[in-house]
Amino acid sequence: MTKRSLPPAPAAAQGVTIVLASGRPTAGITPLAKELGLDKKGGCILAYNGGKIVDCATGEALYQKQLAPEFVPQLCKFAAAQDVAILTYDDRGIVCERDGDEWARKECVTTKLEMYHVDDLASYVDYPICKMLITVDPARRDAVCEAGKAQFEGRIDLYPSSPFFIEAVPLGVAKDVSLGALLDRMGLTRENLMACGDGLNDRSMIEFAGVGVAMQNAEDAVKQVADYVTAADNNHDGVAEAIEKFILQ
């Protein structure tokens, strides 16, 4: 998002609720929510690709789905067999056995959170988590993801969210599902929803929304389900373009 996209006051003044929907953990989205003033004006954080929704003003968890504990060691074993890194999050930031891994470090850049080394991630995680993240060389992403889907089919969901990330989340967790739950809570329907995005993990909510907007830099699979593709990308006012076209007119 850019400075032109950041001030949501005109949209908020029209009764629009801003929801920041991301694969990031809650702590990785909170700084942007505060920059937007959502902690004062109201709004929501949708974290972990839909695993959790938090009210920015109250801190209340409005919706939450967690990975069953037995999947943590299973996913760690799978990652080791594939020779890739896997990580999750605690109150401090990111936790990972391969804290120096090139692809794992990209999650630090994405979330602006610190990474902490643990000797045995499966033993360390003795608390509820919403997701684990497999990080992988882009050349191997699809093969690793397909292997994971085959191993965990019908038990948890695995899907790519970037060229080097594979999300591991509870079965059925996705941005469209959690947004649907939030809309129900608010007494609204998907026709009242505009969703903007560029990543593969945005595809479901863009297809679900009454107005689905893909950024110019979005992957083709995302553009295919969008109602509108912006002229600008997400780093050059693409979100602002959508807000001005569909909300502020």
Locate predicted features.
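Hydrophobic packing residues within well-ordered alpha-helices of enzyme cores
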Residues: I29-A33, V144, G148, I206, ...
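Short active-site oxyanion
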Residues: G15-V19, G43, K131, E191-N192, ...
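A generic "binding-loop/recognition-motif" signal
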Residues: P25, N49-G50, D91-R92, F164, ...
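Conserved acidic, metal-coordinating active-site core of Asp-based
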Residues: F78, Q82-C196, D202-S204
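Mg2+-dependent phosphoryl-transfer enzymes with acidic/Ser/Thr/Gly-rich catalytic loops
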Residues: M1, E167-Q249
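Short, hinge-like loop/turn segments at secondary-structure boundaries
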Residues: E35-D39, Y63-Q64, W103-E107, K175-D176, ...
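Active-site phosphate-binding/coordination module
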Residues: L6-W103
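Short, structured coil segments at secondary-structure junctions
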Residues: L36, K41, N49, F152-G154, ...
